[in-house]
Design a protein with these regions (language model features):
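Active-site beta-loop-alpha junctions enriched in small/polar residues
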Residues: 8-12, 35-39, 72-75, 103-106, ...
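Hydrophobic residues within beta-strands of alpha/beta enzymes
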Residues: 32-34, 68-70, 99-101, 127, ...
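The substrate-binding groove and active-site-proximal loops of carbohydrate-active enzymes
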Residues: 71, 102, 211-213
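Active-site acidic/histidine proton-transfer and metal-coordination neighborhood
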Residues: 59-66, 74-156, 166, 263-264
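Glycine-rich, proline-tolerant flexible connector loops at the mouths of alpha/beta enzymes
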Residues: 33-57
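N-terminal small/glycine-rich loop or linker at the start of catalytic domains
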Residues: 1-6, 66-73
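Histidine-acidic metal/acid-base catalytic patches
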Residues: 1-6, 14-31, 57, 61, ...
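Flexible, glycine- and charge-enriched loops at secondary-structure boundaries
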Residues: 46-53, 77, 81-84, 106, ...
């Protein structure tokens, strides 16, 4: 399977966007995702100012590495969709295609999500919804229900291999999802047995992910259940892998390409 592969910013979040682009190019990746929105107030994000955006655009063109998605938007009762406009403008300027989100439960969630999708559509962007065990929408069925209820034509279900599995999803479930919801997938491995509590799940997601075939997630089965044209990226933050960035990125790329070839020869 010879197809484009992306590198998610969360894998090397200490790198600036330009550094990430250069690393991706050196390791063989075709595109990147970028952290342009903080996961909580004051948390790290790399949204550039106007001058930084122009420079990043220049670097991306020079390296031949594109932007696919930007993250992370937590949709809760406090979120003002207008606050997302700078992120959307930057993503559109750089040729991005999708925004990654997750959501909590609150009155008006469906309308809020639909409004964000409508706002994103004005910038030529789609919105992917990710299942996370510690958020209000913590099963794949919950996420798919919101997509359906919103009626948004640019909405999708982000198949993160770790989150989908830890939230109770199975590879077979993906075969039943309407194909127009399956735009993007993020790959990594992890131990077969899930952590015992939410603190453990958080720690695993944020720093305990493994290279493909180092763990026990059903990665080949997940890939086999996905549409042929789904966009594949790697999201693999690790708190223990101390290899130099380029060495680690190349190892991640090689392991993921081998997985893809085995799953869909």
């Amino acid at each position: 399977m010879n197809r484009p592969l992306g590198l998610g910013h969360f894998t090397f979040l200490h790198l600036s966007p330009a550094e990430l682009v250069r690393l991706a190019r050196g390791a063989g990746f075709d595109f990147v995702g970028m952290r342009f929105n903080p996961v909580s107030p004051g948390a790290l994000n790399w949204l550039p100012d106007a001058a930084g955006l122009a420079e990043l655009d220049r670097v991306m063109r020079g390296e031949g590495v594109g932007l696919y998605d930007v993250e992370t938007v937590i949709i809760d009762a406090t979120l003002d969709p207008a606050a997302l406009v700078p992120m959307m403008e930057a993503a559109a300027r750089l040729g991005g295609q999708r925004i990654n989100t997750c959501a909590d439960r609150f009155d008006g969630l469906v309308d809020r999500f639909a409004g964000i999708c409508d706002l994103a559509n004005g910038y030529g962007l789609g919105v992917d919804l990710e299942c996370m065990a510690w958020r209000g929408l913590n099963t794949p069925a919950d996420c798919l229900a919101l997509l359906r209820d919103s009626g948004a034509g640019n909405a999708g279900y982000l198949v993160d291999a770790l989150h989908h599995t830890r939230c109770g999803g199975a590879p077979a479930d993906l075969s039943a999802v309407p194909a127009h919801y399956l735009r993007s997938a993020q790959l990594c491995d992890a131990p077969k047995e899930a952590p015992a509590d939410l603190d453990g799940l958080l720690a695993e997601a944020r720093g305990g992910r493994l290279l493909p075939d180092e763990g026990g997630l059903p990665l080949a089965e997940i890939l086999a259940a996905l549409p042929e044209d789904i966009v594949l990226s790697v999201e693999l933050p690790s708190a223990t892998d101390e290899r130099p960035d380029l060495e680690r990125a190349r190892a991640i790329h090689a392991a993921t390409v081998a997985l893809m070839a085995r799953a869909r020869p």
